[in-house]
């Protein structure tokens, strides 16, 4: 097969050969050093916080007279939050354990959060479009998240900062 050459006036020529290897997307690798791991975990914290704030604001806006047509997307976003929180907690545990900075209390706190996150199934009772129980659930998760992030996580992250320094 032949080669097709494409060009625009003033731009670089591009060649499309039939036997040209397809370029694979770059492989994503998890960071191996603590500073990069910490940065990724902090970005996840930020996204989780935004998700919680958004869902709480939407639940307040929906109120007890929620329209059944509006709630499915909100319920889907609640499920996304549950999944994102679970994945974040597992990754954080793995990395903190790798640096010797995950204690049993921190792990137990994560277990409680996972249990609390799974206690509510948004939209399970479709006859009741009132998001008030979910609002209370979201506020409870938010409270845990803020306390945990500023408490157990902050302590464990400082320990990991110290543990990964050369000569310590």
Predicted features, each with a name:
Residues 2-168:
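Small-residue-biased structural context
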């Amino acid at each position: 097969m032949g080669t097709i050459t494409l060009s625009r006036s003033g731009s670089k020529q591009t060649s499309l050969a039939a036997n040209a290897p397809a370029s694979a997307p770059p492989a994503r690798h998890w960071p191996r050093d603590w500073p990069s791991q910490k940065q990724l975990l902090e970005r996840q914290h930020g996204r989780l916080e935004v998700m919680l704030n958004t869902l709480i604001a939407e639940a307040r806006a929906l109120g007890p007279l929620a329209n059944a047509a509006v709630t499915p997307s909100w319920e889907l976003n609640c499920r996304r939050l549950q999944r994102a929180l679970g994945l974040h907690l597992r990754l954080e545990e793995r990395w903190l354990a790798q640096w010797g900075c995950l204690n049993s209390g921190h792990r137990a706190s994560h277990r409680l959060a996972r249990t609390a996150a799974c206690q509510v199934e948004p939209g399970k009772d479709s006859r009741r479009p009132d998001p008030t129980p979910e609002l209370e659930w979201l506020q409870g998760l938010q409270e845990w998240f803020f306390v945990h992030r500023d408490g157990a996580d902050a302590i464990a992250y400082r320990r990991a900062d110290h543990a990964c320094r050369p000569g310590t």
